[in-house]
């Protein structure tokens, strides 16, 4: 019988509503053949807020599972033996805390924690650049990344303490060269800091524990070459910069989720083929094959996938690994001159970008530069789709077709339980009432001391977890110790002429502004905890290029703060971007704040919004609703001009 290589880990990124509901989902997925867990946490957990915090309103359990305390984590992994599991936790700013809770639960299960296997993402650099779930400034955040790494070296030697995460960089518009360079710059920043925390003889092994989490887009030949370039460049950095001699410690180890940015709301059944093609990029080449793969569901552009949708993506992996003969062969592309040329070109471009970052002082000093580059690259990507230079089937070519039977009936998505947030808050209140308050206070005081003294925060975090502290209490101590960070928006003040078709819009903006007696003022806001800022940035940048007076202050603002800003700026139109599924409660609150403030201007909303919700929003007073199918930004700009022309002129 032909010898086959072992397949990669099959993961499904999952978590929603409550710890109990997510536990049931995990156990079901494991029974279906999933070989590892990939935990999605909700936004309050990711950003260090308890479920009853004002900023958490409407966000609890929406994009992942809420974890407020040890009881939640205990429930999440009920009847799942952690010593036997390989668990990936997509968590960053609160990674030390979630790992502390995980360790505490494993110890309760009787596990030998030195045998625990898994990963915390723990990459704060990409949070500043794209994802937005940061808490503290870059320097103390870097310190906590390496605190986790130094702790796992001693106590969890099989644990990956960090995923250098280029996934979200591509989602934010990075070119392959930028994705390579920005991710490698992050890896360098982490290893430079980690080298000061571990004995020299143990440093090579720690380098070997750093893993990567990457993206794979539809241009799958280029993406495969990108992965081969990653392998070569990481080996080069480990050997030349850090003097790592053992080849096994220089190995580029990575997991992947294929691209979600390219999944379309229009003709969503086509996404199945996109996902399959993108998976080939990270599985075909043995030399650059992923260690773990998780695939999005075909309907992510519509809303929250159902268990069946996730099962379909899992089956895709299983068919490739077990029915095909892919794993019977050595690397299929070694010696291919076209592949080698492309790999070398990508490496040269990445080295040039990396040298520029290094000249600025490294990744932390280059955050503003990298953010601006991503916003520019994403604007160029969107412009290519708008003009048709980049073909997207069902979006800008071949847009007519028969209705899909997949999207009939229940709307093809899972709807969040509206009672889940109230239930979670009730359990949180019961947890607080039943714990030893003095023990919690003492544990938090010790955490504060460790944070301010420079000690590793992991032991104090584990003690706080066992004492009964909450996610919000843990994060509050770090905010007190290090302060809270406001990230760059990447939206430059100067307009750009890179986009076609702007002249008629600029003329319309100038005409309306002349009648108003001042420039058309457009305030863009991101309410709640949703850190996916790409859409808001692109709307703000395009409006700026069209001649509007733009205010965009970035992410994580309350409805009251956004409305106050719009009132202070005398906005003619207010726009909200919400991609977390929390559009209904957040928009309702913004409308109430607008009424209280006497702000009578059009409100427009963009996000992943089902049509029934969009209809309800319009009925409640929202002037326009935009979803991923509305990819033509110039048309949105003309809509805004028309709204202002009809409403604000009459008022003024």
Curated annotation (Swiss-Prot):
NCBIfam families documented for this protein: acid_CoA_mut_C (TIGR00640), acid_CoA_mut_N (TIGR00641)
Subunit relationships: Homodimer.
Principal EC category: isomerase
Pfam families (UniProt xref): B12-binding (PF02310), MM_CoA_mutase (PF01642)
An annotated Gene Ontology molecular function: methylmalonyl-CoA mutase activity
Task performed by this protein: Radical enzyme that catalyzes the transformation of (2R)-ethylmalonyl-CoA to (2S)-methylsuccinyl-CoA. Is involved in the ethylmalonyl-CoA pathway for acetyl-CoA assimilation required for R.sphaeroides growth on acetate as sole carbon source. Is highly specific for its substrate, ethylmalonyl-CoA, and accepts methylmalonyl-CoA only at 0.2% relative activity.
Protein name, UniProt field: Ethylmalonyl-CoA mutase
Binding site for adenosylcob(III)alamin: 532
UniProt pH dependence: Optimum pH is 6.5-8.0.
